[in-house]
């Protein structure tokens, strides 16, 4: 199961990122827990200078923009493939 964190204070872009993330999870059928992170200390611990940010399984995959649901779905597929190959 993936842990996906949407980082940001709850602004319009943060809400769009969360919606795109939920759509990507639905598109891929991935098992995922989506967590909204609004605590600035936690956000800054990832080294993110601008929000929104997206973290999948502890890895920052995007910040400062709103990636499309298609982009997010591709990142999820790549992570699943890498995990399967690592066995």
Q: Where are these predicted regions, by residue range?
A:
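Structural micro-motif
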Residues: 47-55
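Glycine-rich phosphate-binding loops of nucleotide-dependent enzymes
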Residues: 85-87
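Non-catalytic, surface beta->alpha helical segment in thiol-disulfide oxidoreductase systems
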Residues: 56-83
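Local sequence-structure signature of Cys/Sec-based thiol-disulfide redox active-site neighborhoods
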Residues: 1-25
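Thiol-based oxidoreductase modules, predominantly thioredoxin-like and allied folds used
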Residues: 30-42
